[in-house]
UniProtKB/Swiss-Prot annotation:
The keyword Cytoplasm applies. Belongs to the glyceraldehyde-3-phosphate dehydrogenase family. It comes from the Bacteria. The record marks 179 as: Activates thiol group during catalysis. GO terms for molecular function: glyceraldehyde-3-phosphate dehydrogenase (NAD+) (phosphorylating) activity; NAD binding; NADP binding. D-glyceraldehyde 3-phosphate binds at residues 151-153, 182, 197, 210-211, 233. This is Glyceraldehyde-3-phosphate dehydrogenase 1. SMART domains: Gp_dh_N. Disruption phenotype: Cells lacking this gene are unable to grow in medium containing glucose as a sole carbon source but presents the same growth rate as the wild-type in asparagine-containing medium. Keywords: Cytoplasm, Glycolysis, NAD, Nucleotide-binding, Oxidoreductase. The gene is gapA. It is found in: Cytoplasm. The active site is at 152 (nucleophile). Homotetramer. Interacts with BrxC.
């Protein structure tokens, strides 16, 4: 039986989680909470400028969504503790508003009747941060109720950093994410707490910060203090890449690095880590469900132990598919 999921926040990630769940028989979205009315939610679910029209029948019945004949209850409650997850049969809540990333705030969903909460972002004081393919085996149903799915960038970096570290050992590394713009930026110049993110997103390359590299240590403790980096926000609406330059503990060739990454992509990390030897560009990865896809043509080695690896990720679709995978995994291991 599919685990019943509620989504709090029906924005870019919330709607993409819904889309991903439609293709996963182990997960069923039964309720959505968002401060927008059902007609607008239905419209934005059905028509997407990045991912295209949803291949499903979408309509509205009163205040609820109806997708492929199934009713999804819609509410518009600001306080998570006042939601009706228990009455609605919701077992896992996907917290995707971007506002409730502290454990104490996200835990209000538990007060409302949910059994577990997945925060679709880096969190504060969460019970555990999980990156699928890297550390999901650490999940403990008895002690982990509020779980962070980390960031889309950490989901891209961690799987191939794990391969490099397991195979060759990482001494230190610096990463840059070349990241599509998001709703945390301005379309035209407007005030923002980050002076650079205040500038027009579709007109500029914007240097900014990311905690993704340091956050890798949350799922790979052996890399604590060994990775750091930053971000460049670029004028594309979706698909990003991670550029990692790392010093390894042993000398390697580019061929050896690619061989290790390809082996992992075809083995233990299949469906999480992809591997491509084609000369592709960002648009080719729109809709890609992997967390990370190695651009093998870009792998470089200098002086034996310094390696450069580039990996692509659909920062919306790939990440949202991992949220759904995590929900299914939690349901299997115990609520």
């Amino acid at each position: 039986m599919a685990v019943k999921v509620g989504i709090n926040g029906f924005g870019r990630i919330g709607r993409n989680v819904f889309r991903a769940a439609l293709n996963n028989p182990e997960v069923e979205v039964v309720a959505v909470n968002d401060l927008t009315d059902a007609n607008m939610l239905a419209h934005l679910l059905q028509y997407d400028s990045v991912h295209g029209k949803l291949d499903a029948e979408v309509s509205v019945d009163g205040n609820n969504l109806v997708v492929n004949g199934k009713t999804i209850e819609v509410s518009a409650e600001r306080d998570p503790a006042k939601l009706s997850w228990g009455k609605q049969g919701v077992e896992i809540v996907v917290e995707s508003t971007g506002f409730f990333t502290k454990r104490a705030d996200a835990a209000k969903h538990l007060e409302a009747g949910a059994k577990k909460v997945i925060i679709s972002a880096p969190a504060n004081e969460e019970d555990i941060t999980i990156v699928m393919g890297v550390n999901e085996d650490k999940y403990d149903a008895a002690n982990h109720d509020v779980i962070s799915n980390a960031s889309c960038t950490t989901n891209c970096l961690a799987p191939f950093a794990k391969v490099l570290n397991d195979k060759f050992g990482i001494k230190r590394g610096m990463m840059t994410t070349v990241h599509s713009y998001t709703n945390d930026q301005q379309i035209l110049d407007l005030p923002h707490k980050d002076y650079r993110r205040a500038r027009a997103a579709a007109e500029n390359i914007i240097p900014t910060s990311t905690g993704a590299a340091k956050a890798v240590s949350l799922v790979l403790p052996e890399l604590k203090g060994k990775l750091n980096g930053g971000a460049m926000r670029v004028p594309t609406p979706n698909v990003s890449l991670v550029d990692l330059v790392a010093e390894l503990n042993q000398e390697v060739t580019a061929e050896e690095v690619n061989a290790a990454l390809k082996e992992a992509a075809e083995g233990d990390l299949k469906g999480i880590l992809g591997y491509s030897e084609e000369p592709l560009v960002s648009g080719d990865y729109n809709g890609n469900k992997n967390s990370s896809t190695i651009d093998a043509l870009s792998t470089m080695v200098m002086e034996g132990s310094m390696v450069k690896v580039i990996s692509w990720y659909d920062n919306e679709s790939g990440y949202s598919n991992r949220v759904v995978d995590l929900a299914a995994y939690i349901a299997k291991k115990g609520l």
